[in-house]
């Protein structure tokens, strides 16, 4: 029988903020307001694709866990070996799974380190590395703004003439640098400007998502749904008035209801006493406001063996990133969106060996490939949508990544 590989989790004293600890060796992150997990080095990584990708991911993760001997003196969510995941939007595209060699976690002032191997506890950086600013050249994406508006108009016609109720159309922009792009400076900037979002990085996909697709913690399930958006002006009084108008907007409330319904329906078979608030709240971010609803529930006792992969298969794609009905919306996206989404709008986050974890939807993000960055934004299209307004909304959703690069 092969010898098991040791995995050790130990408490930490004071250290640099999580995002300042990262070396340049394939960083992975999931950080919100300073708390979360960061990791580096690759103990194991693989990719999955196809209709059985969530099941294939589960099998691979469990195969890796069978090779490990875990010594964990901290015993909270996020300790022990951690799987970082980034699933594609479309099953036919590649999804990535990464188990880092070293993970540092922090929650409510307590922190820990996990490392794989029989070496001594790794030493952490004691001073933040100075990262140089890069120069970027911006270009159009797969479609020009005008071409994208034409596709939005096509989608509206489809909604008005078929059973389709809502579809999410995304667009991209391409950015080039004269050298390989270092994600760490971008991640720090995103965290500073958008501390209430989840700052993620997995295999070159980096971003700041405001949308928590799934949190599993000791049998409790949470999903935050965002749909319905309005840009901020920077004037507090004006923004309060805009927030009130967003909360009354029939178009945005309709779009939001589709998204909430799709998540609640997906969770219902697994949960008892699912809580769906009657009306959404307005979530204020640095540059936009969203209608938001937190859907919560407790796993049915007989379903305690259900894991995140099972629930993700039912949750994704939700109406917030695809549409309603799902199959009709997914087909229209494939027909008219004009680009591969890759891992944009797919589940991204982490799981631990207990089955606890947090996964968001990969929004407000970009994919780094050496010296190129491709950033994404999507808009929910319903019968009352206007192509020009949707273009404006998409530009607002590009703002976090644009700002993080400046």
Language-model features, listed with the residues they occupy:
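Short, solvent-exposed loop/turn elements at beta->coil junctions and helix N-caps
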Residues: 88, 202-204, 348-352
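Conserved hydrophobic core element of enzyme catalytic domains
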Residues: 294-406
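An anion-binding catalytic pocket shared by soluble metabolic enzymes
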Residues: 39-47, 94-102, 111, 171-258, ...
């Amino acid at each position: 029988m092969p010898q098991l590989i040791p995995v050790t989790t130990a408490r930490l004293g004071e250290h640099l903020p999580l995002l300042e600890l990262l070396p340049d060796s394939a960083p992975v992150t999931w950080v919100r307001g300073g708390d979360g997990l960061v990791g580096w080095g690759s103990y194991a990584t693989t990719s999955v694709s196809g209709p059985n990708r969530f099941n294939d991911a589960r099998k691979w993760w469990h195969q890796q866990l069978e090779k490990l001997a875990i010594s964990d003196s901290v015993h909270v969510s996020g300790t022990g070996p951690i799987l970082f995941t980034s699933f594609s939007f479309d099953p036919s595209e590649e999804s990535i799974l990464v188990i880092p060699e070293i993970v540092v976690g922090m929650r409510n002032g307590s922190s820990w380190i996990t490392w794989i191997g029989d070496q001594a506890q790794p030493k952490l950086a004691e001073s933040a590395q100075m990262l140089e600013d890069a120069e970027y050249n911006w270009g159009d994406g797969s479609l020009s703004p005008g071409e994208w508006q034409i596709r939005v108009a096509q989608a509206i016609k489809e909604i008005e003439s078929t059973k389709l109720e809502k579809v999410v159309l995304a667009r991209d922009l391409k950015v080039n640098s004269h050298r390989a792009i270092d994600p760490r400076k971008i991640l720090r900037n995103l965290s500073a400007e958008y501390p209430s979002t989840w700052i993620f990085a997995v295999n070159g996909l980096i971003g700041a998502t405001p949308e928590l697709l799934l949190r599993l913690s000791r049998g409790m399930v949470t999903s935050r749904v965002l749909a319905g958006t309005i840009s901020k002006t920077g004037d507090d009084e004006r923004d309060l008035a805009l927030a009130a108008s967003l909360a009354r907007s029939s178009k945005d409330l309709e779009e939001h209801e589709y998204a909430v319904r799709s998540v609640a329906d997906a969770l219902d078979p697994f949960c008892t006493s699912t809580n769906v608030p009657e009306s959404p709240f307005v979530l204020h971010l640095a540059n936009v406001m969203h209608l938001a609803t937190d859907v919560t529930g407790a796993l049915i006792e007989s379903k305690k063996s259900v894991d995140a992969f099972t629930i993700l298969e039912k949750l994704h794609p939700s109406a917030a990133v695809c549409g309603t009905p799902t199959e009709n919306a997914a087909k229209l996206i494939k027909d008219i969106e004009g680009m591969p989404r890759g891992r944009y709008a797919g589940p991204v986050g982490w799981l631990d060996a207990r089955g606890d974890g947090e996964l968001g939807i990969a929004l407000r993000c970009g994919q780094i490939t050496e010296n190129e960055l491709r950033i994404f934004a999507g808009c929910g299209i319903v019968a009352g949508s206007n192509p020009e307004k949707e273009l404006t909304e998409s530009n607002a959703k590009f703002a976090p990544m644009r700002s993080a690069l400046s």
